[in-house]
Each structure stands twice: as C-alpha cells, then as structure tokens.
C-alpha cells in the first residue's frame, strides 16, 4: 500500500513538473552560415554573386571563376518580430538583406534596404523555423527555394517558386542555418 502511495506521488510530481515546465523558444542566429540540401547539393553554402548581387548555392563559396564570395547571416526566429535576413561579407562589411525579385524569375539576392524598394523586391518575411529558413507569406510558412543551373560546375542560382506555379529551378532545396563558433 505504501509503495502505491509513493508511486502515485511520484507520478503526480512528474505530471506537475511537465505541466509547469517552461518551453524555451528557439532563438535567431547570428554569424550563421546558410547551407543548402537538395538533389545535387548536400551541405553546400550560399554565396554572394559579386557580378549581380544574387545568391548562389556553391560547392566552393569562394569560387573565383563564378566571382562568388562567402557570407554570414543574422537571422530572426519565427517567434521574433523582425523577419529580415541580413548578410555580412567575410571582412565584416554589411552586404544587405535577402530579397526575392519577381521580375527576375524570382531570383533570391542581397541588397541594401534602401535599394530593394527600387527593384520591387520582397525583403521581409525570412526567419528560422528551428534551423530551417522559411518565408512568411501572409501567415503561411513556406520553404519554396529551388536551385537553378548556371554555366559553372558546382554552382546553382537560388530561386523562389510561388505556390501552384511551375518551379523556377532544376530541383527543390532546403536551407538550414548553422552558427559559427
């Protein structure tokens, strides 16, 4: 009888502990690398195209033939208020914010905030859901990123595809963030 009472108290203690346990929200990340996972790219970083300001999935983010350079990112969490993904060059200079440009087959690029309005791009709505980069399209979280072939081996352009439309790339990709230590 005493063991049943003890067991009941133990379960009650465990149940109350679970009920009052505070969940820790997943925070954003700073100084993170965005890596891409897809059919032809596993853990390839996203690089910046110095010629056009667009983002590329590259086996080598410093690919000089494609004129690419690596970036680090400051990324908000979906529980945060500022859903903007800001990029920084390796030398510490701000590159700008991630944007989607409808006029360029929904290419994804980086520009300073002041210039994004002139190219009619979408800059807000990018955040992390756990470690995956998503886009908030009117309260729907979407991850519709695609890789598009380029003329360089091991380099794909990063694009966005709207719901119910023909994909604007060769294969879908998932983008995940990892913080550098």
Describe every region a protein language model picked out.
Residues 1-23:
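Fungal secretory targeting signals
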Residues 96-118:
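Low-complexity intrinsically disordered segments
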Residues 49, 57-104:
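Short, well-structured hydrophobic secondary-structure segments
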Residues 3, 95-97, 126-127, 145:
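Aromatic-enriched hydrophobic runs in primary sequence
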Residues 20-54, 110-181:
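Extracellular glycan/ECM-engagement signal in secreted proteins
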């Amino acid at each position: 009888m005493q063991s049943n009472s003890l067991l009941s108290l133990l379960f009650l203690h465990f149940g109350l502990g679970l009920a009052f346990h505070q969940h820790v929200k997943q925070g954003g990340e700073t100084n993170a690398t965005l890596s891409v996972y897809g059919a032809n790219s596993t853990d390839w970083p996203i690089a910046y195209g110095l010629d056009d300001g667009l983002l590329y999935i590259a086996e080598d983010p410093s690919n000089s033939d494609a004129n690419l350079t690596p970036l680090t990112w400051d990324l908000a969490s979906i529980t945060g208020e500022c859903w903007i993904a800001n990029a920084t060059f390796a030398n510490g200079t701000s590159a700008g914010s991630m944007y989607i440009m409808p006029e360029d087959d929904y290419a994804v690029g980086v520009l300073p905030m002041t210039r994004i309005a002139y190219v009619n791009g979408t800059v807000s709505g990018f955040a992390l859901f756990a470690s995956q980069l998503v886009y908030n399209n009117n309260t729907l979280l979407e991850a519709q990123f695609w890789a598009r072939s380029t003329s360089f081996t091991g380099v794909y352009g990063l694009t966005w595809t709207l719901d119910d439309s023909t994909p604007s790339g060769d294969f879908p990709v998932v983008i995940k963030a990892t913080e550098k230590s």
